[in-house]
């Protein structure tokens, strides 16, 4: 009979793989930003939230750099404020936990509660409200929602095998949020305008026949106001 510990280890390994996929799922978004050299209506909120996750720091730093380079001044200012707030908050938490909580159990409880809060925000951040307002899923990528669902489901199962409330709550809520996003995607997918190539149509010009004469008006400097402009005939000869 397979032991619960073995099952938990296998699920944990799968969860790590899916989590890595979750952090890589925004790659198509940032390829699009680089290609268009504009962040369009994408938001930095999901990226700013998940930078708190240690294993994704390098990947998220790359995303933030790309977003910063192609953002306007308003978005750059917002990112700076949020990142500075995160850094100050994490420093305050570290100092507070080390100095105020003197037992491992108490420290784990405080940090665990914070992980529940920020983990829940991470799952709920991909622009659900914007989809409802615009009735378009253009800026809520399907890949991110699918991987979020798989990631939350896997880690929920992992936490239930040997119950861990700090893993169960954010990931269980993550599954619900991902299902909501997938339902919204199914509802608004058909109403999302499809991108079409805008080919510029240049006006066609009729060919000029050989030995064509063109009559054009010519202004006369000696004429006074109200006088009639004279005309000149221009002969055009096209050599073969």
Curated annotation (Swiss-Prot):
Q: Name one GO biological process term.
A: carbohydrate transport
Which residue windows are transmembrane per the record?
Answer: 10-30, 47-67, 79-99, 109-129, 141-161, 165-185
| Residues modified by glycosylation | 225, 235
Known Gene3D superfamilies for this protein? 1.20.1280.290
Q: Which domain of life is it from?
A: Eukaryota
**What are the residue boundaries of the MtN3/slv domain, all occurrences included?**
10-48, 110-191
GO cellular component annotations of the record:
membrane; plasma membrane
Molecular-function GO terms, alphabetical: sugar transmembrane transporter activity
Q: Which residues lie on this side of the membrane: Cytoplasmic?
A: 31-46, 100-108, 162-164
Regarding the membrane, this protein is recorded as: Multi-pass membrane protein
Q: Which keywords annotate this record? A: Cell membrane, Glycoprotein, Membrane, Repeat, Sugar transport, Transmembrane, Transmembrane helix, Transport
Topological domain, Extracellular: which ranges? 1-9, 68-78, 130-140, 186-240
Q: What Pfam families would the database entry show?
A: MtN3_slv (PF03083)
Q: What is its subcellular localisation? A: Cell membrane
InterPro entries the UniProt entry points to: MFS_trans_sf, SWEET, SWEET_rpt
Query: What does it do?
Result: Mediates both low-affinity uptake and efflux of sugar across the plasma membrane.
To which protein family does this belong? Belongs to the SWEET sugar transporter family.
Q: What subunit structure does UniProt give?
A: Forms homooligomers and/or heterooligomers.
Name of the protein in its database record: Bidirectional sugar transporter SWEET7c
